[in-house]
């Protein structure tokens, strides 16, 4: 609950349309593997090129969406691996995006759908989808 409150407080303080709970701003809590961090840094770089915004945790699904973002997401939210791609169309639509530091814990169960050979597929798919979101009419 404390981490959710950080997102709610940021929304009240900033009136941002999208609030992202970021693992990497304060580097507290679970930080994921080195290889996964490289992938996240790649999507940070790609997002920065396409949107001119520096969002450090582009793969975080811990988000709070305001009404404008919800309306846009209802029409355009990707089915597969939506986190990096959605930031591009939120940015293109002129929505305000804010990151706040949160503490996340390691996965308690289950397995990531992105492991082994599927990592290459994921990176390729999200890169192409992000570029298409950049040129797509919103």
Description of each model-found segment:
Residues 53-54, 75-78, 87-105:
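Catalytic donor-sugar/metal-binding loop of nucleotide-sugar-dependent glycosyltransferases
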Residues 1-80, 107-124, 128:
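Acceptor/aglycone-binding surface of glycosyltransferases and processive sugar-polymer synthases
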Residues 92, 113, 136:
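A C-terminal cap/extension of S-adenosyl-L-methionine-dependent methyltransferases
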Residues 84:
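DNA-recognition element of transcription regulators
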Residues 125-138:
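C-terminal, non-catalytic tails of nucleotide-sugar-dependent glycosyltransferases
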């Amino acid at each position: 609950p404390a981490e959710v409150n950080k997102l709610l407080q940021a929304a009240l303080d900033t009136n941002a349309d999208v609030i992202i709970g970021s693992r990497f701003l304060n580097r507290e809590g679970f930080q994921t593997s080195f290889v996964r961090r490289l992938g996240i840094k790649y999507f940070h770089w790609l997002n920065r090129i396409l949107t001119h915004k520096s969002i450090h945790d582009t793969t975080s699904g811990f988000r709070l969406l305001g009404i404008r973002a919800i309306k846009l997401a209802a029409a355009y939210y990707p089915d597969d691996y939506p986190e990096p791609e959605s930031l591009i169309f939120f940015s293109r639509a002129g929505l305000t995006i804010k990151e706040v530091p949160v503490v996340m814990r390691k996965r308690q169960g289950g397995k990531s759908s992105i492991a082994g050979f599927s990592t290459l597929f994921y990176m390729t798919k999200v890169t192409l989808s992000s570029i298409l979101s950049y040129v797509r009419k919103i």
